[in-house]
Amino acid sequence: GTTEGFRRVKEKRPDLICLAGEPQEDPNVISSVADMSVIEDFISRGYLIVHTAKKMGAKKFVHISFPRHMSYESISRRAAIMQQACKDLGMKYIFETAPDPTSDVGVAGAQQFMLEKVPAWVKKYGKDTAFFTTNSSLHEPLLRQLAKFGGYYVEATSASPIVGYPGAFNIDLSKEAGDWPAILKKVEKAVIKAGGAGRMGTWAYSHGYANTLALVYLG
């Protein structure tokens, strides 16, 4: 709906600058109306996430998503690159489906599904498997169960140390707010305590946070 929203704004106020950070619409669609549209390099990440998973020790890669997300150009293209990267690097690519948190089951239902399914997936595919999901609300239960049952986690779809980790490991970051080195240090400590050392990763800074600052500066 962002593209249509921008279009309506421009009809009434063409002088307003419309900036899109991490838009869900296809790049060519949102770019037709936005003054600037910024998204992470999903093409490179499609390869780099799989490559990093292999360096961490993974032999299989499980991509978890649902039809709505897979209809997006950026997500489906990244998934296709991940599949090819697995083939090139000698890893097995596996696609698993999870409930859409915007469906009738809601966020709670989707998270409960993950809590129940992740242990079964680890048992089925082995602890030498890396898991990746396209939805931010699914990272928390995924991290929690991987710490407990095994498996690898390279990074979140919207990479950031505050996506998934605080909720999964009960990390209070109120005192560290805005201090990314301090946040990363506290998250790392919690991951090690939970048994995820060497099996879990993230970016040093929040992609969304940096994206927003950049758009405000450029706008």
Name these PLM-found stretches.
Residues 35-62, 113-116, 186-191, 207-219:
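Hydrophobic alpha-helical segments within soluble ligand-binding/sensing domains
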Residues 9-42:
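Flexible loop/hinge segments that line or gate small-molecule binding clefts
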